[in-house]
Amino acid sequence: MIVYSELSLKGKKAKDAAYKLGSLSSQVKNKALEAMAYALVAQEEEILAANALDMEAGRQKGMSKALLDRLMLNKKRIEEMAEGLYALVSLPDPIGEVKRQWRRPNGLEIGQVRVPLGVVGIIYEARPNVTVDAAGLCLKTGNAVILRGGSEAIRSNMAIVKAISKASEEAGIPEGAIQLVEDSSREVAQQMMTMNEYLDVLIPRGGAGLIQAVVKNATVPVIETGVGNCHIYVDADADLEMAEKIIINAKCQRPGVCNAAESLLVHQDVARKFIPHIGKVLTEMNVELRGCPRTLSLFSGIKEATDEDYATEFLDLILAVKIVDSFDEALEHIRKYSTGHSEAIVTRDYSRAREFTRRVDAAAVYVNASTRFTDGFQFGMGAEIGISTQKLHARGPMGLNELTTIKYVCYGDGQIR
């Protein structure tokens, strides 16, 4: 196990790197991002070989198909990670942006300027793409990053960080700007949670257990990237063909991600027509349905849903289904079980759609669209560092701006108070 002194050394290197990063030009940072993207593709074979070992170990451990999908890399996914870095190059550099500026009666000029957070710590699970996204976003915003990924992806992460850190340093980025903690034990994660001397913020990405452990135990400031117990509500006035497409996309495209749908609510006025149809379609797509008693009466052969099912982020091809008597009952169900991530309504009633967006308390609320769009790249932010479900500092997909803070820069000509 890594000892605290080794982790502290990484922290010191990151702190030193952050000091230098904060004053680098956009040109240097963009050049480094391009070099990192090129290195990912150039070292694809080494990265895929490392990932193959992680995948085999995951199968031996009995990881679910959804979790293995999160872990898996292939040529296309590596190219997508590289494209994410290239996309960051084309985005404006937020560092140095003057958010607002004003002049006081005494002539003092005050400006509110974006600056880096400093050193960002990321604790995450078996998703190698997070390694690239986090490194790229932090570099673009002048932040150093210390990455602690899950043991399931350790070989993949080591290969990725070896490629991108070397490429970035050769392009002018200071050593220590991108570091990986290779010990993925819980003890090391606990140590990171108390590294206030070195870390300016800690961002957990993963399941409920990991996130709650960090929120509960960290003394470092935390931005909580929440669990995604996302709902789709099919209203009485819904276009049912549209609803079918949205549900299939939200549940089946990538069930192991936080913006996938976990619960389906259907208004009783359309349930008799819609439930048997959507039940058949989803069952044929290998989705395990768990329904309320009324759902079971319309589509037999499925499990009865429990309260725990309605509260669960399955991250798998499982969907909890409930028939509701009214729009208000749907909202109450969402209020009770939502994790505040992403919620959707399918309806042709504009006033009801507006009411849904006002009353549902979530980071992203959708009208006639899939919850799968809650994603930094899909929102046009480039990659994302995570999806925040808290309300302080950042909420929703966290792109470049969310990795900055502000500094007040004041110009005078001898003013005293």
From Swiss-Prot:
Pathway assigned in UniProt: Amino-acid biosynthesis; L-proline biosynthesis; L-glutamate 5-semialdehyde from L-glutamate: step 2/2
Q: What is this protein called?
A: Gamma-glutamyl phosphate reductase
- Gene giving rise to this polypeptide: proA
- A Pfam match: Aldedh
User: What EC number(s) does its UniProt record assign?
Assistant: 1.2.1.41
| EC category name | oxidoreductase
* Keywords from the UniProt entry: Amino-acid biosynthesis, Cytoplasm, NADP, Oxidoreductase, Proline biosynthesis
Its job: Catalyzes the NADPH-dependent reduction of L-glutamate 5-phosphate into L-glutamate 5-semialdehyde and phosphate. The product spontaneously undergoes cyclization to form 1-pyrroline-5-carboxylate.
Q: Report the sequence similarity comment from the record.
A: Belongs to the gamma-glutamyl phosphate reductase family.
UniProt catalytic activity: L-glutamate 5-semialdehyde + phosphate + NADP(+) = L-glutamyl 5-phosphate + NADPH + H(+)
Write down the species. Answer: Heliobacterium modesticaldum (strain ATCC 51547 / Ice1)
The subcellular location is: Cytoplasm
Task: Supply one GO CC term from the record.
Answer: cytoplasm
Indicate yes or no for the key word Cytoplasm: yes
Statement: the UniProt record of this protein carries the keyword Oxidoreductase: yes
* SUPFAM superfamilies for this protein: ALDH-like
Q: Which GO terms describe its biological process?
A: L-proline biosynthetic process
A GO molecular function term, named singly, is:
NADP binding
